[in-house]
A protein has these predicted regions:
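Helix-coil-helix junctions within alpha-helical repeat/solenoid scaffolds
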Residues: 1-239
Length: 240
């Protein structure tokens, strides 16, 4: 999932679920439900979660964080941002035990930050940034450093900072080097939105195209849909 080979991840998880001796291990189908949610199949994610009674009843922080992060991405797939933010932050509530850079918090933080920004919830965005800023040196995964740079650049763009284009471009470069293809695609679309707003259509369309290619390769319908919402603006540069 981190490398962006979601087809291989799907195949490996499916084989594991069908393997003798692993059928009762609920963490495996839960990860499969997580992948379904990432791809936009909220129904499959919901069905998977409903079939995990032991995991849902567990008081283990790692189990609770896993359930919460799947619920967060499933809510995002259903276009329920308030619920997505709530569940993502529920995952982050276990940072003290699990560490901010463990799997679930490492994926939950970017979703929470993105959703808070999109909702205009500046208080939540500030609290999420503070969570990373307060981490001791060496505890923050490079991916999270890149995601923190992105949300700061998005906030600067929202506030009309004249240097926002530069900081957004730098943030995308950081994502390209340090994060996942999924998160890079979202960052490219963030950057393209700002570029379109400021009239740099050519650069925006290049970013949209790259994000769309990543989305198609991942089989990530929410990303495909997001890229396509920006497509009509291309008519402004289409030759007549």
């Amino acid at each position: 999932m981190l490398l962006g080979d979601w087809a291989a991840a799907d195949e490996a998880l499916t084989q594991a679920m069908d393997s003798e001796g692993l059928t009762d291990i609920e963490i495996i189908p839960c990860y499969h439900g997580w992948l379904a949610a990432l791809r936009g199949d909220a129904g499959a994610a919901k069905s998977t979660l409903a079939a995990l009674p032991k995991l849902r009843a567990s008081e283990d922080p790692s189990d609770k964080a896993l359930i919460s992060v799947v619920e967060a991405f499933a809510a995002a797939a259903r276009h329920h941002p308030e619920s997505a933010l709530r569940h993502a932050r529920a995952t982050l509530a276990h940072v003290g035990t699990l560490g901010i850079s463990s799997d679930c918090p490492r994926w939950a933080w970017p979703l929470a930050a993105r959703t808070a920004h999109d909702l205009g919830d500046t208080a939540a965005a500030g609290e999420l940034l503070a969570l990373l800023d307060d981490c001791p040196p060496g505890h923050l995964a490079p991916m999270l450093k890149a995601e923190r740079d992105l949300i700061r650049a998005r906030l600067a763009a929202r506030d009309g900072d004249p240097g926002a284009a530069t900081t957004l471009a730098a943030a995308v470069s950081g994502l390209r080097e340090l994060s996942t293809p999924y998160h890079l695609a979202h960052g490219l679309l963030d950057h393209s939105t700002h570029l379109l707003r400021t009239g740099d259509d050519q650069a925006a369309h290049a970013a949209i195209s790259e994000a769309g290619i990543i989305a198609q390769r991942l089989g990530c319908q929410p990303l495909v849909d997001r890229a396509e919402t920006l497509q009509p603006t291309r008519s402004r540069t289409t030759p007549t």
